Amino acid sequence: MTVPEIISDGKSTRRNLQKLLFFGATSATLAIAALTSRSIATRKYIPTFFQLNTKIPTFSSKSEAQAALGLSSGLSLGIFAITTTGFCWALDISSASDFKQRMKTLFNTIDEKEYMNDSDPETNKIIEELEALINKK
């Protein structure tokens, strides 16, 4: 197996994992959104033909508040998860340290050489092999 094959294989595996995390967060958020919509629809009071529409049915405000808090928290966390996983997938960020390094380079607080030296030993070995191949030509 050559160096480019190793790099492309590892990258495709990582990007597939990021894609699955993104789609998992999206499907969970859509499920919570459907649950929220169904919950709102069941709470809607529609009187029958001979019932008064001015008489409000009894309900527990405590359970209503708990349900609203739980559903809104679920939607907020879901949107946050979609945003985070989508951002990491689009920018090919695989870990928190990778994110930190990318933000430092974005704001010009880290040198490019320092960014490259902070990677793992396996990556350094692959980089050295690539540089040797390039310099050989």
From Swiss-Prot:
Organism for this UniProt entry: Candida glabrata (strain ATCC 2001 / BCRC 20586 / JCM 3761 / NBRC 0622 / NRRL Y-65 / CBS 138)
Subcellular location(s) per record: Membrane
Bilayer topology annotation: Multi-pass membrane protein
Keyword Cell inner membrane: no
GO cellular component: membrane; mitochondrion
Membrane spanning residue stretches: 20-42, 69-91
InterPro entries: AIM11
Protein name as it appears in the record: Altered inheritance of mitochondria protein 11
Similarity comment: family membership: Belongs to the AIM11 family.
Keywords: Membrane, Transmembrane, Transmembrane helix
